[in-house]
Structure formats: structure tokens, C-alpha cells
A protein has these predicted regions:
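Outer-membrane beta-barrel pore domains
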Residues: 27, 31, 58, 92, ...
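A generic local structural motif
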Residues: 3, 252-253, 288
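N-terminal periplasmic/intermembrane-space "pro-region" immediately following the signal or transit peptide
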Residues: 2, 17-84, 91-96, 247-250, ...
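N-terminal presequences and immediately downstream first alpha-helices
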Residues: 7, 34, 38-41, 237-241
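Bacterial N-terminal signal peptides that target proteins for export
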Residues: 1-12
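Intrinsically disordered, low-complexity segments enriched in small/polar residues
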Residues: 11, 18, 55, 59-62, ...
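Outer membrane beta-barrel
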Residues: 64-221, 228-247, 251-261, 322-350, ...
Length: 424
């Protein structure tokens, strides 16, 4: 709108100037009419020229993303957002949680699970890119930085990036929250995931395989000062092999009717050196590993993963170290072109030497209705938490982000979730 209005702004300015001349020296008005008309014409011509330059100097629109770009394509800014709004019903047995607080057997309520704003693009060269994303807290509304990364893609398949981002470890965590199969990720993922860290990552990709390597401040080290990070240093590596299909189709966990066959295997490992500080507890080194497989075809998809975690400090119960495991399997099947049913089973396996060494099992099932793909979809599911927190020491209480509340020694909790997602 601004370029179109520039001639009118210029004309108004010229008229104002002319009025000033008239009132300042009325007798001279007749003698200066030609000069005023010439000045107005010159200003209008100049404004029209600037308007044309503005129109020719930038591009804007929507090609899957809202964007602003230079005509030569060397500069581009994309603006995006994500909104997830839920209604949750949580059912537990009366009793007390692990902190000995009384349990309310029915907890219903709305939740704004995710509200995110993102900016990404490139400058000077399409290979020199940036990505900045933040989210508003669902409990306080405070805006918090998630991703802040800069990278460069080389022509030979190699790439490097640095900043704050998710380390290349669990695939379920690496797949965007906007592209999950169920309402949210699994309980196993919430316990073992890498989250974000401040790091440098180098990657290499071919049509059949790709590898990622990162040097970082450790798992869950986002928005930390350099002297307040959880580890002195950490390294993470992930390798993926593509047996069929394309990399693009594995950006989510679903496969639409008519989708091509795809099969991918992933392996990852992470080691971090615990902080060595005077007067601090013994150094706790961490080693985590995972293997996962993704298979999808015409209207159906399958995914499975196994995760292991070794903590060298551990506890006195385990003789100085803890070994914990988790696994999950999930699948989706389209019933119509827009309706997809899904189910998931996941299990947490604590160290057998701990007092709370019972496995914790969760069953999830539900459906997606896609109005416009992931950009506008309705999801509903039911989670059955079959065991109790007190019997599984790996659990640390509630995971409210997925609707799970601390059930103490009472098993049999179940949760019903309804969610609408909008992406722009």
C-alpha cells in the first residue's frame, strides 16, 4: 500500500508548502503560481519514480511460506508460526502422588501447548542461511528462545551450522512437534530426548546415506551461560541409511494414500563429560545410544526405536552407575484421504538394581483429521498409563506437556486429549 500512496503524500506535502507560501506573502501569490505548479509536478514525478523502484526492488508472497525476497534471490526472509490448542481430561485413582500430595482423581482443562514464531532465510547467498525460533510459555506466557542457528550448505553435500538447536540424536525429537503422528511425542521420548544445546554441527548427505556430528555443551543445554552448562563438553553422532524413498518423506511420521515406498534406518550415539567443579558431587559422565527404523508406503507408516542411557555417577543402589532403556513402536493407517488412525506402545525400563525397577508401559491410540495437511489438522487420542510412578525410579513425576500427572503408587491412569493445530 505504501508505494501506491507515495504520490498522494507528495501532493499533500506540496499543497501544504503552497499554502504556507500563500499565507506568508499573499500579494506575491499570483507571481509564483507557475513556480508552485512546477514544484508540485517535480515532486509527483519523483514520488512516482520511487514508488516504481520500491515495487521492482522486492518480492513478497506465499509459496508454502510467507516470504520477503530480493529480485535476484540472494536475500530471503520467511515468517512462520505454530499454534496447538488442547482440551485434556486426566483420570487417576484417589491416593497420593510421589511427593505425598493428595491426588485429584479427575483433572480436565484447556492447554495452549505450543505457540511459536519463527524467522528463517538466507543472506547474500542461498547457501548462507539462518533460523530463529521462539515459543511462548504455556504456563507464564513468557517468550523463550528455542532455535538460533546459522549455517552454510556446500555444493558437495556437506553442511555446517552453529548456534542453538536440537542435537542429532533421537529421531522422534528431531521430527517437528507440528509433524507428529499422535497429539504429542511419547513418554519415552520425554525421558530420554536430547532437547536443544549450543553447538557446532557438521553433516554430509548423499542420495543413499547421511551423517551428522556435533560438538556441544551437552543434552538439554539451551539458553545456558558458558559456565553454567550441564557438561564440560559433549559429542553426538547420527547416521541414517535410506534403502527406499526420499529424505523429504521422512520429515514426518505419516504417509498419505498414494505415497511412495520408503525405508530408513538410523543410528546415533552421544557422550558428554560431566562438569568438574570444586566442591561439586562426583563427575557424572553420560553415554546414550539409539537405533530406529522408519517404513512407510501407500497410506500407512511404521516407526520403531530403542534407546539406552548410561549415567556413570548413578546412585548408591546401583553401585555408582545407572543403565536405563526405553523403546517404542507406532503406526498409522489412512482410512480415507483425510482421516488417519494410529496407535503407539512405549516402555520405560529402569536399572534393575534400583529400588523402583518396574517397567512403565503406555498405550496410545487415536486419529488425525487433516483439513489442510499438517497446516490445519484435528487430532484426538487416548493414553493409557498402565503402571505407577512409585514403581519406576526413572520417572521424575509429572510430564504435563503430554498430559501425564504423577500418580504415586496408583496405577491405571488414562488421559483423553483433543487438539487443533494451525501452521502459517
Amino acid at each position: 500500500m505504501l508505494p501506491a500512496r507515495l504520490p498522494w503524500v507528495a501532493a499533500a506535502g506540496a499543497a501544504t508548502l503552497a499554502a504556507g507560501v500563500v499565507f506568508a506573502d499573499a500579494p506575491a501569490t499570483a507571481a509564483t503560481n507557475d513556480e508552485i505548479r512546477a514544484m508540485v509536478a517535480e515532486m509527483l514525478s519523483d514520488a512516482q519514480t520511487r514508488s516504481s523502484l520500491l515495487q521492482a526492488g522486492a518480492a513478497a508472497g506465499h509459496d508454502g511460506h510467507f516470504f520477503l525476497a530480493s529480485p535476484d534471490g540472494n536475500f530471503r526472509l520467511e515468517i512462520s508460526g505454530q499454534l496447538q490448542f488442547r482440551y485434556i481430561l486426566n483420570f487417576r485413582d484417589n491416593g497420593r502422588d510421589s511427593a505425598n500430595n493428595p491426588i485429584d482423581d479427575f483433572e480436565p482443562g484447556f492447554q495452549t501447548r505450543r505457540t511459536k514464531i519463527g524467522f528463517k532465510g538466507h543472506i547474500y547467498d542461498p547457501n548462507l542461511w539462518y533460523n530463529i525460533k521462539g515459543a511462548f510459555s504455556r504456563s507464564s506466557g513468557v517468550f523463550d528462545l528455542e532455535d538460533a542457528e546459522v549455517g552454510y550448505n556446500f555444493d558437495n553435500g556437506m553442511a555446517v551450522k552453529w548456534g542453538q538447536f536440537k542435537l542429532p540424536f533421537l529421531r522422534e525429537e528431531l521430527v517437528s512437534s507440528s509433524r507428529q503422528l499422535a497429539v504429542d511425542r511419547s513418554l519415552v521420548n520425554e525421558l530420554f530426548n536430547q532437547d536443544r544445546s549450543q553447538a557446532i554441527e557438521v553433516s554430509y548427505e548423499t542420495d543413499a546415506w547421511r551423517v551428522f556430528g556435533a560438538f556441544s555443551n551437552g543434552f538439554d543445554a539451551d539458553n545456558k551461560e558458558f559456565n553454567a552448562k550441564p557438561a564440560d563438553w559433549a559429542i553426538t553422532g547420527r547416521a541414517e541409511v535410506l534403502f527406499a524413498g526420499s529424505w523429504k518423506q521422512f520429515k514426518d511420521f505419516t504417509s498419505k494414500p498414494g505415497g511412495e515406498d520408503g525405508l530408513m534406518l538410523g543410528l546415533a550415539a552421544h557422550f558428554e563429560r560431566g562438569k568438574d567443579a570444586p566442591g561439586a558431587p562426583p563427575i557424572s559422565d553420560r553415554f546414550s545410544w539409539t537405533i530406529d527404523a522408519s517404513w512407510e508406503s501407500d497410506g500407512w507408516s511404521l516407526y520403531g526405536a530403542f534407546i539406552g542411557n548410561h549415567d556413570s555417577a548413578g546412585s548408591s543402589e546401583t553401585g555408582g552407575s545407572v543403565d536405563e532403556y526405553g523403546w517404542l513402536v507406532q503406526g498409522g493407517l489412512y482410512l480415507t484421504d483425510d482421516l488417519e488412525a494410529f496407535a503407539r506402545y512405549d516402555m520405560v525400563i529402569p536399572d534393575s538394581d534400583q529400588a523402583g525397577d518396574n517397567t512403565f508401559n503406555t498405550i496410545t491410540f487415536g486419529a488425525n483429521y487433516y483439513l489442510h495437511g499438517h497446516a490445519a489438522k484435528f487430532t484426538t487420542d487416548v493414553q493409557l498409563f498402565l503402571d505407577d510412578v512409585a514403581g519406576t525410579e526413572t520417572l521424575e513425576g509429572s510430564e504435563k506437556g503430554i498430559g501425564f500427572l504423577d500418580n504415586g503408587a496408583e496405577s491405571g491412569e488414562y488421559v483423553v486429549r483433543f487438539q487443533f493445530q494451525l501452521l502459517f
